[in-house]
Amino acid sequence: KNLGVSTITVENAYDQLIGEGYMFARPKRGYFIADVSDIRVIKAPVQKELSIKLPPEQDESIFDFSSNRTDSGNFPFSIWAKLMRETISLREQELLSVSPCGGVRELREAIASHLSSFRGMNVDPDQIIVGAGTEYLYGLLVKLLGTDKVYCVEDPGYKKISQIYECNNAKCLPVQMDEQGISVELIKKANAQIAHISPTHHFPTGITMPVNRRYELLAWANESSDRYIIEDDYDSEFRMNGHPIPPILSIDACEKVIYINTFSKSLTSTIRISYMVLPEHLANEFYRRLSFYSCTVSTFEQYTLARFI
């Protein structure tokens, strides 16, 4: 009463002090101050100069010849900003909701429609898993397919792929390329179960795998139930002439191809939105075993990209 506060406020203060160990209560006796004199207070050590070696930052060169970037001058900033405003206006409740582990349905439906019209692929939205970058999806695939298998990658190839597999405790073997792409005979000699390839536009050679080699790979995968082809369709959107070659998934009749692509080349590398298309039985396995993983792309970006597509 003297302090001008309510009884509830005083009781809450006592409960807080008891909860933190500064006081204790005895029935019918009252409240008592706890003895904290024996508690040792550990002083923070004197801050020393750290020697953390960070990777060097990329220089803003006058001429950028790197192959993994897009021209920022061509990005449709005005359209993207407009779609972001529309998303905030039309998706107030959805933006505050947790995204499904595979990504929001609107984006998965937009991707499925895009793949149908642009790549000739007939996929169900429920087969599509959205993630922040292909590197994250590679890690999910190791967890889905298992570390007891041998993963083969193209040699030469994108070094980071083998690094990610090895960091996820998967055995990874480089397989040499010939003029038509990765060698199926060498895959067999390596006793591999998983072949990670980029048949449409191989990095760094630029080789496009011919149709006969694609069928050879499918025949290899069909020889055993535990064999799969990871088709990395990175940088497949652009060709000097004609339409892009249909992906291996479009000729896969036995559900042996896992398709991966990203929007980092068609939009910008800083928008970390990628996706993979799983065969039906692997999609069911993913949702049964790995659905506890949260989608790593914000709902805001997902809804905005869905409207953009």
Question: What residue ranges belong to the model's regions?
Answer:
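Walker B catalytic acidic pair
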Residues: 232-233
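PLP-dependent aminotransferase class I/II
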Residues: 257-309
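A generic "structured core" feature
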Residues: 3-9, 17, 155-165, 192, ...
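Short glycine-rich anion-binding loops that position phosphate/pyrophosphate groups of nucleotides
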Residues: 70, 200-202, 265
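Residue-level recognition of strand-loop junctions within catalytic nucleotide-signaling folds
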Residues: 34, 200, 279-280
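Conserved core of the PLP fold type I
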Residues: 84, 94-226, 237, 243-258
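N-terminal basic, amphipathic alpha-helical segments
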Residues: 1-85, 291-298, 306-309
